């Protein structure tokens, strides 16, 4: 029979004999879940029993106290007494009480571990945290390991900063399982470390430990090793990786890893690696790959051979926007650059020299720099292309000279070893005469150019040369120098650079320079997360709005792609509370960067902000959506942006149109039926005389983005192979968003363009063979959009025929007579029935078409594949349907996972001839390569003459 009151048992606690008290406690423990409210009145007596050192069953008293506190909702006290209960508290018991206490214990341990790790990495060896709390934490992990829940154990150990537990768990796992299972577990650990661990030091320790485990495996997973190298940005580990590959004598895989590093590693890592490998006598072909030259050459070749440029659309924009106005001339220059980006095709400029001649001052600077966008990645011919416009040439305009230096940087962005010295010499030669108008324009272009060329290289000489320009305190050259310094030191977090730039930002009287330094500081702190917090706090607390503006972008870059909650809260607070419109706009834009990986949540988060009374906040919302959802075609983002394209404020419409183009880049009408209407809207804005200039600018640039790179590039912010953010793409978007103040910075978006192709190359000689792959999709699902077609001609206006007055009167009388008689009833009924029938047929046809279209959009898979040529356009949405043909001559050196980029192939029939694709570099190479070896048959019968 169950007890209805605990009074008799509680009375026994006042007895003198310990055995009676023990009996009472054990009995109370059985009913505490039902009668806890009554027992809570005697809680002081139960606690007193626990505090009595002479009492033999103190642990039972602690357990009861814990259960009472648990039911009262006081979890900290409940955990305290549960820990004191020692073995009486059974963590294996299946009850809500035990689950809650264990959960709260782990939470408390994690909080303490987080605090202690920053002070001492070996905190767990020194009993700094309550040993009882540590005991529950460790017992829980043991329980997980016994139940073969290794992933759960690793997750808990990661949260508790216990590298020792992770190491021992992995060691035992690696000894038991196969290599493939072990690689899966380490990949899981890496994903957790990269996406959830907030402490940079601890994350680095995990990655290094994972690298050691992978290197000691019998069959190395080089893709995972490469992922660790890129995330740590450590050239030393990269050297170890290539050393192991050399020992295994796998040239094909070495080449593939080198190509992967070129697409994802920093310029600093690549330069150190090339220097070290050269000193150690590595294969020149491998060193050539690491220089970036082959990758850029392949991409230029793909973009040139497959260009699908809508010249008609560009010409329509040019003719609709008067080139006399620098705003419109700049818009067309930027759009032209984007549409031809990387194709090395400057035919539009050559065909429109009179239009080009209309450019004045900075519009001339932007137009010249657009050549750099067109020839992006043309590392071999870049300087030759820009030679007619560079200082020392016959070019008379200072804006052309400055623009050419900026363009040179755009060509060599991230691969600037061959041009850095040239640009540095120009800066050094001219920095002494800074302040002169001609020299300032030159230094402006050179500073931006060298920032691009030396991006992420941490080159001290470049930094010092730019600092010299900055300290001359000229608004024009100083702003560009500040941005160049940030680009050069990208992601390094160098304390001296941060100190120099922050101090000078408070001293200078030029707003342009302060803003340049603020954005430069953000660039230096790229990817540094909590290590940038002190600087962020200082910047956001500043009275100078331009520094607060930079503070928002510092959060954006320091926490890019992390989805960090505290960063999001901070930005939302600034977005709704700051007194300055520019700062509020920057804070909303920054949300897009922080939530890059969680892009599906962005429309929901910014939806209310898109309806803000403040136009700058609405503008920031548009950019945030464009950045976070770039290249994704996300419908919920389009739904938020659509009303903003009709906003009453011109710059909000501008931002909305640009954001839509970034989201819908490489989308066709078949992938998204809204694309056609959006393109029509862009064109109608450009051609409408009543639209404001800023809206027209936005529509023109948006057209350029939608058709970028000859319709063969997308904006890809994450590297699928390594799981890291694409640094160039992120930097390109940050700098592009600064075009609000300075239109020439719009060219930076070209850094974010990634060619949409799979380029299969032969590992033995890096040649591109002609072969085909399978695509298991409907053949026309991913075809190019239709080209713009202007209406064939206007209808000829009909001229009224002269009519005599007598004829007119006769016609009027006849009409009146007919009206009086009225139509035949049967005729009326017949006519009505025919109209109804026609309407029903139309409705049915429209419905069927719509259903067919929807079915097509949803299901693109086809069981019967069609063939796709090597080095042709393969959209990101299409790549999942691509596979190499089974038992084909060319097979990838590692498993193909549907990612775009360079794929190294193993040739199964190396002695057989094969047709090759000629690259841009080979087309212009006067020293033709040796022909493929061939046999001459001695017994050849030549026909007689």
Curated annotation (Swiss-Prot):
Q: Could you tell me which residues belong to the region Disordered?
A: 810-851
N-acetylserine PTM sites in chain numbering: 2
Q: Which domain of life is it from?
A: Eukaryota
What the entry lists under InterPro entries is as follows: 26S_Psome_Rpn2, ARM-like, ARM-type_fold, Proteasome/cyclosome_rpt, PSMD1_RPN2_N, RPN2_C
Residues bearing Phosphothreonine? Answer: 801, 932
Protein name (record): 26S proteasome regulatory subunit RPN2
What is the native source organism of this protein? Saccharomyces cerevisiae (strain ATCC 204508 / S288c) (Baker's yeast)
SUPFAM superfamilies from the xrefs? ARM repeat (SSF48371)
Q: Where is the composition biased (Basic residues)?
A: 810-819
Q: Which family does it belong to?
A: Belongs to the proteasome subunit S1 family.
Question: Which Gene Ontology terms describe the biological processes this protein takes part in?
Answer: proteasome assembly; proteasome-mediated ubiquitin-dependent protein catabolic process; regulation of protein catabolic process; ubiquitin-dependent protein catabolic process
What Gene Ontology terms describe what this protein does at the molecular function level? enzyme regulator activity; ubiquitin protein ligase binding
Phosphoprotein as a keyword of this entry, yes or no, is yes
**Other facts:** Present with 4750 molecules/cell in log phase SD medium.
Q: What is the lineage of its organism?
A: Eukaryota, Fungi, Dikarya, Ascomycota, Saccharomycotina
The Gene Ontology CC terms held by the record are: nucleus; proteasome complex; proteasome regulatory particle, base subcomplex; proteasome storage granule
| Residue ranges, compositional bias (Basic and acidic residues) | 820-851
**Pfam families the record matches:** HEAT_2, PC_rep, RPN2_C, RPN2_N
PC repeat residue numbers: 366-399, 403-440, 445-479, 480-514, 516-549, 550-585, 586-618, 620-654, 655-692, 698-734
Q: What does this protein do?
A: Acts as a regulatory subunit of the 26S proteasome which is involved in the ATP-dependent degradation of ubiquitinated proteins.
Q: How does it assemble?
A: Interacts with UBR1.
């Amino acid at each position: 029979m169950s007890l209805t009151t605990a009074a008799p048992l509680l009375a026994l606690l006042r007895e003198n004999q310990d055995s009676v008290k023990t009996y009472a406690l054990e009995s109370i423990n059985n009913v505490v879940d039902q009668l806890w409210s009554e027992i809570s009145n005697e809680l002081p007596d139960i606690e007193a029993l626990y505090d009595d050192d002479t009492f033999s069953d103190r642990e039972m008293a602690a357990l009861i106290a814990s259960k009472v506190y648990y039911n009262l909702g006081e979890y900290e006290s409940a955990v305290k007494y549960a820990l004191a209960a020692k073995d009486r508290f059974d963590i294996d018991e299946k009850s809500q009480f035990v689950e809650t206490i264990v959960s709260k214990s782990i939470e408390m341990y994690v909080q303490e571990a987080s605090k202690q790790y920053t002070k001492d990495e070996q905190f767990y060896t020194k009993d700094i945290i309550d040993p009882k709390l540590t005991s529950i934490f460790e017992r829980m992990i043991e329980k997980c390991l016994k139940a073969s829940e290794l992933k759960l154990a690793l997750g808990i150990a990661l949260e508790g900063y216990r590298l020792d537990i992770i190491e021992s768990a992995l060691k035992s796992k690696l000894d038991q399982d196969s290599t493939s299972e072990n690689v899966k577990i380490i990949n899981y650990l890496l994903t957790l470390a990269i996406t959830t661990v907030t402490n940079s030091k601890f994350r680095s320790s995990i990655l290094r430990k994972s690298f050691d485990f992978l290197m000691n495996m019998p069959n190395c997973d080089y893709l995972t090793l490469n992922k660790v190298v890129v995330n740590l940005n450590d050239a030393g580990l990269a050297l170890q990786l290539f050393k192991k590959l050399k020992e295994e004598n796998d040239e094909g895989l070495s080449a593939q890893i080198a190509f992967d590093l070129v697409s994802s590693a920093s310029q600093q890592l690549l330069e150190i690696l090339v220097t070290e490998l050269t000193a150690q006598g590595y294969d020149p072909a491998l060193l050539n790959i690491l220089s970036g030259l082959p990758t850029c050459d392949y991409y230029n070749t793909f973009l040139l051979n497959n260009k699908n440029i809508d010249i008609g659309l560009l010409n329509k924009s040019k003719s609709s926007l008067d080139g006399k106005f620098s705003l419109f001339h700049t818009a067309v220059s930027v759009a032209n650059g984007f549409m031809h980006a990387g194709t090395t095709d400057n035919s539009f400029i050559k065909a429109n020299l009179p239009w080009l001649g209309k450019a004045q001052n900075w519009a001339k600077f932007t137009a010249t720099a657009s050549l750099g966008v067109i020839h992006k990645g043309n590392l071999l011919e870049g300087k030759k292309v820009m030679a007619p416009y560079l200082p020392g040439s016959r070019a008379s305009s200072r804006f052309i000279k400055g623009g050419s230096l900026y363009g040179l940087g755009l060509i060599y962005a991230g691969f600037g070893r061959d041009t850095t010295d040239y640009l540095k010499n120009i800066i050094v030669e001219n920095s002494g005469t800074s302040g002169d108008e001609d020299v300032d324009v030159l230094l402006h272009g050179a500073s931006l150019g060298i920032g691009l060329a030396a991006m992420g290289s941490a080159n001290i000489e470049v930094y010092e040369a730019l600092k010299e320009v900055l300290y001359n305190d000229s608004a024009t050259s100083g702003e560009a120098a500040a941005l160049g310094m940030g680009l050069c030191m990208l992601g390094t977090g160098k304390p001296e650079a941060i100190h120099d730039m922050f101090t000078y930002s408070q001293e200078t009287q030029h707003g342009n320079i302060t803003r340049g330094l603020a954005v430069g500081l953000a660039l230096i702190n790229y990817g540094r997360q909590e290590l940038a917090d002190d600087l962020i706090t200082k910047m956001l607390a500043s009275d100078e709005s331009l520094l607060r503006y930079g503070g928002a972008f510092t959060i954006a870059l320091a926490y890019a792609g992390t989805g960090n909650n505290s960063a999001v809260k901070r930005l939302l607070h600034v977005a709704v509370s700051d007194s300055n419109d520019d700062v509020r706009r920057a804070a909303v834009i920054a949300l897009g960067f922080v939530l890059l990986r969680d892009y599906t949540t962005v429309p929901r988060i910014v939806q209310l902000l898109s309806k803000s009374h403040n136009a700058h906040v609405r503008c920031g919302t548009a950019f945030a959506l464009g950045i976070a959802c770039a290249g994704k075609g996300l419908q919920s983002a389009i739904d938020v942006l659509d009303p903003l394209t009709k906003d009453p404020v011109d710059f909000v419409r501008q931002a909305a149109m640009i954001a839509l183009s970034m989201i819908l880049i490489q989308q066709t009408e078949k992938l998204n039926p809204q694309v056609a209407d959006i393109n029509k809207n862009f064109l109608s804005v450009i051609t409408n005389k009543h639209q404001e200039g800023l809206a027209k600018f936005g529509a023109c640039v948006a057209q350029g983005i939608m058709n970028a790179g000859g319709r063969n590039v997308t904006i890809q912010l994450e590297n699928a192979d390594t799981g890291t953010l694409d640094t160039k793409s992120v930097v390109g978007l940050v700098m592009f968003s600064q075009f609000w103040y300075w239109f020439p910075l719009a060219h930076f978006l070209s850094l974010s363009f990634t060619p949409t192709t799979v380029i299969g190359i032969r590992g033995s000689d890096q040649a591109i063979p002609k072969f085909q792959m399978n695509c298991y999709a409907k053949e026309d699902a991913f075809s190019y959009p239709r080209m713009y077609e202007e209406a064939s001609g206007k209808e000829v206006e009909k001229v009224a025929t002269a009519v005599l007055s007598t004829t007119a009167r006769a016609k009027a009388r006849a009409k009146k007579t007919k009206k009086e008689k009225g139509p035949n009833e049967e005729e009326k009924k017949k006519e009505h029935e025919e109209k109804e029938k026609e309407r029903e047929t139309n409705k049915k046809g429209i419905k069927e078409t719509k259903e067919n279209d929807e079915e097509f959009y949803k299901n693109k898979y086809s069981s019967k594949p069609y063939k796709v040529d090597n080095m042709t356009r393969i959209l990101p949405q299409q790549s999942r349907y691509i596979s190499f043909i089974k038992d084909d001559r060319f097979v990838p050196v590692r498993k193909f996972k549907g990612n775009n980029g360079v794929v190294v192939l193993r040739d199964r029939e190396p002695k057989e001839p094969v047709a090759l694709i000629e690259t841009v570099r080979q087309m212009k190479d006067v020293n033709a390569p040796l022909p493929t070896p061939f046999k001459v048959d001695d017994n050849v019968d030549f026909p007689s003459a």
